[in-house]
From Swiss-Prot:
<feature type="active site">
    <location>
        <position position="246"/>
    </location>
</feature>
<feature type="binding site">
    <location>
        <position position="13"/>
    </location>
    <ligand>
        <name>Zn(2+) 1</name>
    </ligand>
</feature>
<dbReference type="GO" id="GO:0004151">
    <property type="term" value="F:dihydroorotase activity"/>
</dbReference>
<dbReference type="InterPro" id="IPR032466">
    <property type="entry name" value="Metal_Hydrolase"/>
</dbReference>
<feature type="modified residue" description="N6-carboxylysine">
    <location>
        <position position="98"/>
    </location>
</feature>
<feature type="binding site">
    <location>
        <position position="173"/>
    </location>
    <ligand>
        <name>Zn(2+) 2</name>
    </ligand>
</feature>
<feature type="binding site">
    <location>
        <begin position="15"/>
        <end position="17"/>
    </location>
    <ligand>
        <name>substrate</name>
    </ligand>
</feature>
<feature type="binding site">
    <location>
        <position position="135"/>
    </location>
    <ligand>
        <name>substrate</name>
    </ligand>
</feature>
<keyword id="KW-0862">Zinc</keyword>
<keyword id="KW-0378">Hydrolase</keyword>
<dbReference type="InterPro" id="IPR004721">
    <property type="entry name" value="DHOdimr"/>
</dbReference>
<feature type="binding site">
    <location>
        <position position="250"/>
    </location>
    <ligand>
        <name>substrate</name>
    </ligand>
</feature>
<dbReference type="GO" id="GO:0008270">
    <property type="term" value="F:zinc ion binding"/>
</dbReference>
<feature type="binding site">
    <location>
        <position position="262"/>
    </location>
    <ligand>
        <name>substrate</name>
    </ligand>
</feature>
<feature type="binding site" description="via carbamate group">
    <location>
        <position position="98"/>
    </location>
    <ligand>
        <name>Zn(2+) 1</name>
    </ligand>
</feature>
<feature type="binding site">
    <location>
        <position position="246"/>
    </location>
    <ligand>
        <name>Zn(2+) 1</name>
    </ligand>
</feature>
<feature type="binding site">
    <location>
        <position position="15"/>
    </location>
    <ligand>
        <name>Zn(2+) 1</name>
    </ligand>
</feature>
Amino acid sequence: MNEITIIKPDDWHLHFRDQDMLLETVAATARCFERAVVMPNLVPPVTTAELALSYKERILAARPAGSTFMPVMTIYLTDKTSVQDIQDAKKAGVLAAKMYPAGATTNSDSGVNSLESLYPVFEALADNGMLLLIHGEVTQKHIDIFDREKEFIDQHMVNIVDRVPNLKVVFEHITTKDAVDFVLAARDGVAATITPQHLLLNRNDMLDGGVRPHNYCLPVLKRSTHQQALREVVKSGSPKFFLGTDSAPHAKHRKESDCGCAGCYSAWSALELYTQVFDELGALDKLEGFASLYGADFYGLPRNTEKVTLVRESWEVPNSITLPNGEPIVPFFAGKQISWKLK
């Protein structure tokens, strides 16, 4: 097969950032995705309906001329989030709330310290038909960074899913066989997003033969056995797993430093890279479900009607992109060949 046409996909997890960065990031995503779930970890974070609506307006203003792209807005849970905050968010059209354990990733310092205190908020999300999106890692310093996803499942995820049985939960950017197995065995209303980097790479690609900061993300890349579990589950076509790039831009100097930031800026190549993975797996027939159907169905949103076509054609991801402020950013897979291209 040298050409594949699918329903236009959506990205169910990404980071746009803010201000002039939006002129770069929104265009990159809008080129091939109709909708995207926008993470709220700005500085300060998007914690209220009012802040979410303001952020949405800034995103819409950054769309390329003629674009029909629509952001799906979220709010950021903190220890101070109230049931009223959830009700206000629902009225404002916000579809989901994102839970970051405090300190788990970029701009998560305002995140949750006392998860137990948030159960009334989780109940309010369920009562209002909103989703809970979870960065599923513990943050205790004594727990090895490669084990933090599994520990979160054992310490928290099982309880959340069991104690609020009518709450829709998305286990974001899963990276381990443990997470795959958990989601497969979980009740209805539990799903997961998977990034291109966790399908394409393992920790050797970040650490073997030199440190590659542009492959550094959180949750961190894991060993190859976990990568293979992710690849196998997307190959299976399970509707519990769908596309979420976690595209996360940082200027080059913030990645290439003595304390580099976590995140892969994949928006310019993500759809093509997912296609390459499904091609490698002999499962191109499963791409449309993963990219275009399962996420919309899980969120209770209509499937897109427009279509996109990808062709088997090699191209090279640029080594650098210039941001609107003049600074360079290194895109994910920079300087490498991709075997599929958006038509």
